[in-house]
Structure formats: C-alpha cells, structure tokens
Regions:
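Conserved small/polar residues in nucleotide/adenosyl-binding loops
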Residues: 127-132
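Charge-dense, helix-prone N-terminal extensions
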Residues: 30, 106, 110-113
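Short, structured helix-loop element that forms part of the nucleotide-activated donor/catalytic region
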Residues: 103
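C-terminal structural segments of small proteins and small subunits
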Residues: 114-119
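Beta-rich strand-turn-strand
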Residues: 95-100, 110-112
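Ribosome large-subunit tunnel/peptidyl-transferase-proximal elements
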Residues: 1-78, 83-98
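Acidic, Ala/Val/Gly-enriched low-complexity intrinsically disordered segments
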Residues: 136-137
Length: 137
C-alpha cells in the first residue's frame, strides 16, 4: 500500500544559495530540485512539499559561451504581430533577478502547481533574510 504525505507532515526548510559566478542553467537545476522537493525521499509529483530557496548575489550570475549576448527570450503581447524578443544581457540590465526566475520557471511544470512552487524562490539583490523567524539552512 502506498503511503502519501499529509500537509500536516510537511516541514519546509529554507536554503540559502550564493549565485556569485554561478552558471544560470546549472544553478537553475539545483534550485528546481529543491523547490519541487525531489531531494526528499517522500517526493510525489502531484504535491507541493518542496523547500524555500533564497538566492543572493544574483547580479554576478553568468552564462557559458556567447549566450549572454546571443540567446533570445520571446514573449507575445496577445495582439497580432505582437512578438517581443530580448536578450539576457538587456534583461540583466533591467531586472537581474528575472534571468534566473525565467530559467527556473521553464524547468517547473506548467500549471497551478508550478506557479505555487515558483513562489518558493526568493531572489535578493541586496541580501536581507526574508523570514527572520525561520532559520536558514
């Protein structure tokens, strides 16, 4: 008989990750595993029992090769001919935290569960502890 974890049995931890000189994709895979709860032996894909992740020094994140200048992010406004594109370089100048959030978001499942799990990612430019009552592991 399969035993499932109840909501009352879930204890979320806080992880602090330093992104200084980290590669975006490699860091995003580590964060995604923690947020989804895949590092836990009680993982089940239909439940949210992942941990919180705080990422600091996000302004020092990097890409390998020429992806920082050449990679394209596409989005659509919803209007005819409304495709917009930007590079990580331009996005990093405006919102440095958005580069990592996009990478993690695209590794999570699409839907309500993915949105809930993405809210467990906290990206800090000027680092302050997001939850003083919880200990950061």
């Amino acid at each position: 008989m399969t035993k499932f974890v109840k909501k009352s049995e879930i204890n979320c931890k806080w992880y602090e990750i330093d992104a200084k000189n980290a590669v975006v994709g490699r860091l995003a895979t580590i964060i995604t595993k923690i947020i989804r709860g895949k590092n836990s032996p009680k993982f089940s894909p239909h439940m949210d029992h992942g941990d919180f992740v705080v990422v600091k020094n996000i302004e020092h994140i990097k890409f390998t090769g020429n992806k920082f200048e050449n990679k394209k992010y596409y989005r659509h406004t919803g209007y005819p001919g409304g495709i917009k594109e930007t590079t990580p370089e331009k996005l990093h100048q405006k919102k440095p935290e958005e580069v990592l959030k996009l990478a993690v978001k695209r590794m999570l499942p699409g839907g309500a569960l993915g949105k809930k799990q993405l809210s467990k990612l906290k990206v800090c430019l000027l680092y302050t502890s997001p939850s003083p009552r919880d200990s950061v592991v």
